[in-house]
Regions:
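C-terminal amphipathic alpha-helical interaction region
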Residues: 21-24, 34-157
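Catalytic phosphate/nucleotide-handling subdomain of diverse soluble enzymes
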Residues: 1-14, 18-30
Length: 157
């Protein structure tokens, strides 16, 4: 996440994600991403439920945000810019959750034999408990829409 600061282009990347890759494809590229995660969670063993359940919830949240953006941006292109950074972050938190779930899958059967794998599971549990829930507040920001961004006239700044 530190590369966001170093690059200084987070807003541009967010606009590219939402404008070109999500809205610009009618959600088709997003669907590929979501389908990969759904396949993983549907085929994961029961030992991974502590990760797959919240991952599915986060993905459902992202599905809802994506549908909301696709619908709202048809009539108001300002929604793309207004939602892009928060959407990028929600997308990123969900993608990281998927990566942590994959690492948990590789670690769950080895936790007792190796501290490395135990630490991977501990970190995954931390991520799911402390960081992934942030997608809820990001969703609220996205759904606040663009109206409040345009309440002030330029001379009021």
């Amino acid at each position: 996440r530190i590369t966001q600061i170093y690059e200084g282009t987070n807003g541009i990347q967010a606009l590219d994600l939402v404008g070109r890759k999500v809205v610009g494809t009618g959600g088709e590229l997003y669907k590929l991403f979501a389908d990969e995660i759904r396949h993983f969670t549907a085929t994961a063993c029961a030992d991974l439920a502590e990760f797959t359940r919240p991952l599915n919830i986060a993905l459902d949240n992202l599905d809802e945000l994506t549908a909301w953006l696709l619908d709202r941006s048809k009539n108001n292109p300002n929604e793309i810019g207004a939602a892009s950074v928060e959407y990028l972050h929600a997308f990123g938190y969900t993608a990281y959750a998927y990566m942590w779930a994959l690492m948990a899958k590789a670690s769950v059967s080895r936790e007792a034999q190796d501290d490395f794998y135990a630490s991977k599971l501990g970190t995954a549990r931390f991520y799911f408990a402390r960081l992934l829930p942030r997608v809820q507040s990001l969703a609220a920001s996205v759904k606040a829409g663009s109206d409040s961004l345009y309440l002030l006239d330029a001379d009021q700044f």
